[in-house]
Design a protein with these regions (language model features):
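Catalytic phosphate/metal-binding cores of nucleic-acid and nucleotide-processing enzymes, i.e., regions
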Residues: 1-150
């Protein structure tokens, strides 16, 4: 079932629930978020610069979580996070692993800060998947939170 905001909740017989979060926009040049290589460069330049980059990315994730989840909390952990990255078709192509790693770190921290999950340890987040696509429109990241339960 999809509501007017594009938020999707699916329930099935094994009581799995799925929610989606979208991070849309160009927050880092022509990309949605920086990659791990960009973060390492910032930390090498100055630790506070790297910390600021991480904090900025986390706040972008927090804004998206608040917009799409509207106070929803995981009640039946663990969860699996499914990421779909829509990168700009023009410009520099980036290493998929580095894009995913940094986004995953910032997003899981944001989930904790928003109290969607209590922790990002394996009791709460057991797995993740990631796919990459190219778009000639605005870049974005789609994150599906699948509540698996024990």
């Amino acid at each position: 079932m999809t509501d007017m905001n594009g938020e999707t909740e699916v329930s099935n017989l094994n009581s799995s629930t799925t929610k989606k979060v979208f991070i849309r926009g160009r927050f880092y040049g022509d990309k949605t978020l920086p990659s791990l290589n960009d973060a390492i460069s910032e930390y090498a330049r100055h630790p506070k610069a790297g910390g600021k980059m991480k904090n900025d990315c986390k706040w972008i994730c927090i804004a998206a979580i608040r917009k799409y989840l509207k106070g929803w909390k995981v009640t039946n952990p663990p969860i699996i996070l499914h990421y779909k990255f829509y990168e700009p078709i023009k410009g520099q192509k980036r290493d998929y692993g580095n894009i995913f790693d940094w986004c995953d770190k910032c997003f899981q921290d944001a989930l904790q800060d928003c109290k969607v999950i209590d922790n990002d340890n394996p009791d709460w987040v057991t797995n993740f998947t990631h796919e990459f696509f190219y778009t000639d429109g605005e870049p974005y990241i789609e994150i599906e939170i699948e509540e698996k339960g024990r």
